[in-house]
């Protein structure tokens, strides 16, 4: 039997990354706590439970749950839809590429070693995360075309933040697959996913 609670949390993580990408591309900034939740998820590789990946509490996925609920209600922004579905598609490519998976694991291990020297949200760490995405994930499939302000999208720091958040989105997409998530569920069990997302969201308050 599928654990829809965990599937929805992982999918909310994907949607949260998509929303952060949109914020960064259109405003050059994102909610700081939610941004850190995304970055921190890259460092939690052996969680005891799914909540551990997102700071140990469901409330850290509030923005992602809101975004997922709007998306499942067909009320969401089309760019957001494209972003999170593209992340799921890239995860599918990654799962079929053993070399890419191994390289990704090695690069994440080296990333974790840099914590001794740099804060997770430092420009140096963001650059490392962005390079991991560009080197390993981006070549796997069709590049995600990000729409936003050209002035912001030209800034190297904004570019690195977006790629770092996309890498976090891949982390959530991998988790979604591990929890038993499938694209068929999004098509045929949308109401179940929506009801579960609403139930989890209501528990935050």
From Swiss-Prot:
Keywords for the protein's UniProt record, in alphabetical order: Cell inner membrane, Cell membrane, Cytoplasm, Membrane
Topology with respect to the bilayer: Peripheral membrane protein
Signal peptide segment: none
Domain of life: Bacteria
GO cellular component: cytoplasm; plasma membrane
Record's subcellular location: Cytoplasm; Cell inner membrane
Keyword Protein transport: no
SUPFAM superfamilies: YcfC-like (SSF101322)
Pfam families: DUF489
Statement: the UniProt record of this protein carries the keyword Transmembrane: no
Entries under PANTHER family matching the protein: HIGH FREQUENCY LYSOGENIZATION PROTEIN HFLD
Homology family: Belongs to the HflD family.
UniProt-recorded name of the protein: High frequency lysogenization protein HflD homolog
Native source organism of the sequence: Haemophilus influenzae (strain PittEE)
């Amino acid at each position: 039997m599928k654990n829809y609670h965990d599937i929805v949390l992982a999918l909310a993580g994907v949607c949260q990354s998509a929303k952060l990408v949109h914020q960064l591309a259109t405003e050059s900034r994102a909610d700081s706590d939610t941004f850190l939740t995304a970055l921190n998820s890259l460092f939690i590789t052996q969680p005891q439970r799914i909540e551990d990946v997102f700071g140990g509490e469901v409330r850290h996925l509030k923005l992602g749950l809101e975004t997922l609920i709007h998306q499942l209600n067909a009320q969401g922004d089309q760019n957001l839809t494209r972003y999170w579905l593209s992340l799921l598609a890239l995860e599918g490519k990654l799962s079929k590429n053993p070399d890419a998976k191994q390289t990704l694991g090695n690069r994440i291990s080296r990333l974790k070693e840099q914590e001794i020297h740099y804060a997770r949200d430092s420009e140096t760490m963001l650059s490392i995360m962005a390079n991991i995405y560009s080197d390993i994930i981006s070549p796997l499939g069709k590049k995600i075309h990000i729409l936003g302000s050209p002035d912001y999208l030209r800034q190297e720091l904004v570019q690195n933040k977006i790629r770092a958040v996309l890498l976090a989105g891949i982390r959530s997409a991998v988790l979604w697959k591990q929890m038993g998530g499938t694209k068929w569920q999004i098509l045929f069990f949308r109401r179940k996913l929506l009801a579960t997302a609403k139930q989890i969201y209501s528990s935050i308050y």
